[in-house]
Amino acid sequence: MVQSMRKETKTENLLQTLKNTDLNAFRPVVFWSVNSCLQEDELRRQLREMKSFGLGGIVFHARAGMTTPYLSEDWFRMVGVSLEEAAALGMQVWMYDEFGWPSGFVGGRLLADEANRARYLEYEVKDSFDAQAYAVYSLDEGVPRLLRQGETAQKYHTIYMRSSDAYVDILNPAVTEQFIAATYEPYYERFAPRFGRELVGFFTDEPQYYRYATPISAVTEEEFEKTYGEELKSGLLYLFLQEERAYPFRVKYYNLMNRLYCENFYKKLYDWCRAHGCKLTGHSVEETFFFTQMWGGADCATSYLYEDVPAIDNLAKYSPAGISAKNIGSVAAQTGKNLVMTETFGCSSYSVTPRELRLIGDKQYVFGVDLMCQHLYNYSLAGQGKIDHPVSFGRTLPWIEGYKTLNDYFAALGYLIASSQEEAPVAVVTPMESVYLDYLRLDETAARENVDIGFAAVADELRRNGIAYHFVNEKVLEKLGGTSDGNLTVGGRTYSAVLLANCRELKGNTVRLLGEMCAAGGKLAVAGAKPAYVDGIRTDVPLRANIECKDLPKPAAVRAAGLDYTLRRLPDGRRFFFAVNEGDEPARIELSGDFAPINLETGEGFAPQSVFEVPAHGSLLAEENGSYAQPAFRAAKTVSLVPQFVGAAPNCLTVENVKVALESGETLHGYAYGVYETLIKRGYKGKMRVTYAFFSDAAREIELTAEKQKVRGERFNGEPIAFVQSEEDINFKKARLQAKAGENVYEYEAELADAEQVRGVLFEASVPESLRNCFSYSTYMEPVYIAGDFDVKGDGIAAKQPKSAGDLTAQGMDNFCGAVEYSFTAEAEGRVRLRPVGNYSMCEFICGEKRAAALLGGCAEMELGKGAHAFTVRCYSTMRNRFGPFHWVQNEDGGVSPDSFTLRGGWTDEHTNPGYTPERRLVPFGLSAVEISF
């Protein structure tokens, strides 16, 4: 168990405890995307910067764009530099165990041996026997019969075993051993003294059997016969038949596949790490729903048994966490693991705000997550970096001054969660085993509808009734389960009631344990589908509900809570309550006793109460009997004022359209990524002149920022350019230039030489994610950025016009990225709450010497004396309107990936792509009003 360093004070409240505690072990870490040619000084500088932002460590992560050869001596030298600097800074380092993802193939090296490649099955109905097939069947009245060569049938139901040239067979222990030898061992050979110190351990990412078809392994056949005493091929056709007689085979098959997944991959890594004095963390693939857990390992919960710090991921703004985070939080509670990691914020887009990031984290921490791995901190935004599943943290983030506050918040919340135990009297048996009944990889509809949709209704009922519970996974129950005095025990946890949640299928062990529990007077509820199968066989299951779902026990301190919440107890007996409201309306909470609300952002506690209103998209943290005297804010009056626009940082124009002249004399023009894909698909090799143009209404000074690429002959309006290093990115350069009235042109020469290789990796439909994730290339035509004192007008720049409150993107600040200032005057006295109305990432309110920020919540508060007060409001944008994506037709709320920018694969020519819209889609920015409550 991780121990924090703290001073002992007998009568302290939670805020005092946090102040007296070293929270470093609970501070967020980041995926540090090392995606360029690595330089020692820059590595050290970025680590120091991260430390100043309140981060506790990094995951050192090779990603697309990196040109330092992976696992080369240069690579290990840079790893050593980073470990040395991290040690000096007191930061933790996790080594990501792959180049790209998923983990296991050593950046593609293990694929050279065909025996290592991932296996999968394909099914065809044929008119003749194919001796090259893996298995051939007749199908008589729905019953498959394995055919030998020479036997006849009306139709030949044929199964082929295929192999993937893009990923490895991680269920094969020999492959995992090669992976360890090629990846883990070299780190130990070089850095053994740092293991268990600054090199905390390894992060393994999305290991999976072949996810794009029905999976199998080279060892499945032998292991199936060894486990069940049956021939695998006798029933293999059932993996493709949607009927009840297939259930027993599918239950056996996917239980075996999950065991091979856990024992032959996770456990081998886990055992190696424990033997070498370090830890294992990382996550499986697609933990969000029960049916999607079939895409990687046929059940995620069991993998958490073989990690020191079990982990999940939660992508995009609105990905639900009710299954993934509750699943992992429950197993961690049952196994006594007090650190639970989430890889989070990836794909949430450049438009995501600190308030949205806080909610993304809160909705996972409420279920037991307590350590955050933030996705992503780019070594460089150049090339693939800026489109790599944003958001991206670092110096280019306009609200970077508030980033430490975000990290301080989650360090404090993580400490509280990790140091406490949840009061959860109910065990909810999940329907993971039921997924196997109807699961067909190429038609998941039945599994989704029969399992996940029904379970969602049960989860909603539990939430409405304020039931506090843990999940119980039946495979975990097999290993850790028991009964005691009418209670169910799982590892170190005891549950006084059990709910079967939409479980059509149960393991025989589960039926036995619950039978024992009920016989001893235990409480059992059933919701959703009732159990009808045991180990896949239709059975009159001898379990009867003796309590209604709504009557399940809940903590006595909770009277009414229609939200996700956790009531937790610290070792010294102090309790706290944490609830999260993902809804669009405020929600009411009623507790029994006195609970003092705490604001972790400001470090304030307020007088105890028992009834609370949790704001929309907000959360509540309250300490039982907290010793705080300050009353909670109550407003007698609210006024709304329209602020006056004062000024702004330099404006920006993003130029993303290019004209490319080829050696043949042909010219292509349009969106840079469309032009690039068109050239690559043609297989073009040769020189080209790349031109960016924009118009200006008058001569004016500008600053041009471009990426460092292997180009030559750079000119602006025909004159050579004297670039200098940009302060915002190691691979950006800038130049002060004089734009002229009319058209202005930035141009250079480049040469495409690798079109065939790029085409093969990026645009062949058969090439999966794994190979693209570790592929580095240069387009030679990335967007460029014009900064200066101007307004944006169409594709050009013009004289600044007066600005007013409202959306500034409609007032000539289309691509603005930075801070603007407003002012207003108000008469108020005492405690004042200031709520910015509009679109922003962070708002700083300045009144004389007083400062307060609206960052993680929607308001700022400050104490004012009597009279009129002049306020300055510093309002920060996100990075979205500078970096995009601008032309993607989809809604970004579902997640943003590189394809959202490049629209990869869809270009029929440089102008035509069904995913492309020629309009430039922007996100509103600016304040329309400020509400003042006092």
What are these language model-derived features?
Residues 61-181, 192-193:
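Acidic/aromatic-lined carbohydrate-recognition and catalytic surfaces
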Residues 485-486, 501, 506-512, 729-733, ...:
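C-terminal structured "cap/appendage" subdomains that terminate the fold
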Residues 744-750, 832, 869-875:
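Extracellular beta-strand-rich recognition modules
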Residues 2, 6-10, 22-29, 39-45, ...:
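Carbohydrate-binding surfaces of carbohydrate-active enzymes
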Residues 135-172, 236-260, 329, 333, ...:
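Alpha-amylase-like alpha-glycosidases and glucanotransferases acting on alpha-linked glucans and related
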Residues 135-192, 604, 609-630, 741-743, ...:
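Extended acidic/polar, glycine-enriched regions
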Residues 131-140, 710-720, 842-847:
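Extended low-complexity, serine/threonine- and proline-enriched intrinsically disordered segments
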Residues 98-109, 627-639, 751-797, 876-934:
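Glycine/proline-rich low-complexity spacer/linker segments in large multi-domain proteins
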